[in-house]
């Protein structure tokens, strides 16, 4: 189902093969959709006295899980592709190396990016090529290289602690 729905085409490293998600997401999400459908049907029955027919398929749900990527395609015309741990629309939103391991960054807006830059005493947020998320998207590789050079001097716990301050 992950392959037929397109989910595998957007999962994995950019230069790698399509990959399955590490857990049975299609089965899990279908179960969750079923619970929601049953709750809605029970509510409808309580209100109208009429029962409902619920019809779910693994493929429909697997396809629904690609909604954000589908929206990107429908609004830009650009087919989604694998980005590894990078977010397709937000930078930095990825795994980075630290002195003793890795952490996942999720810097979701320009204010957070300014605060994040200050952890490293960097003026990245003041540079036009990094000051806004659209600019960071265009200059993703350059920025991620700068970030990675700096995160490697922190332990994971120290960097997480610094990030949690903002």
Predicted regions and their residues:
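Active-site-adjacent "lid/gating" segments in soluble enzymes
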Residues: 1-103, 107
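Aromatic-enriched alpha-helical interface/lid elements that frame and gate functional surfaces
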Residues: 91-166
């Amino acid at each position: 189902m992950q392959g037929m729905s397109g989910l595998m085409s957007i999962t994995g490293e950019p230069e790698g093969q399509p990959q399955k998600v590490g857990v049975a997401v299609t089965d899990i999400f279908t179960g969750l959709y079923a619970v929601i459908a049953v709750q809605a049907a029970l509510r409808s029955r309580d209100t109208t006295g009429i029962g409902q027919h619920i019809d779910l398929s693994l493929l429909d749900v697997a396809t629904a899980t690609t909604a954000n990527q589908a929206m990107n395609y429908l609004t830009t015309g650009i087919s989604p592709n694998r980005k590894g741990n990078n977010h397709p629309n937000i930078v930095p939103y990825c795994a980075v190396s630290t002195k003793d391991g890795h952490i996942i960054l999720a810097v979701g807006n320009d204010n957070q990016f300014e605060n994040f830059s200050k952890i490293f005493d960097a003026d990245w947020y003041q540079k036009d090529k990094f000051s806004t998320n659209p600019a960071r998207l265009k200059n993703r590789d350059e920025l991620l290289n700068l970030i990675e050079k700096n995160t490697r001097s922190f332990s994971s716990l120290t960097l997480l602690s610094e990030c949690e301050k903002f």
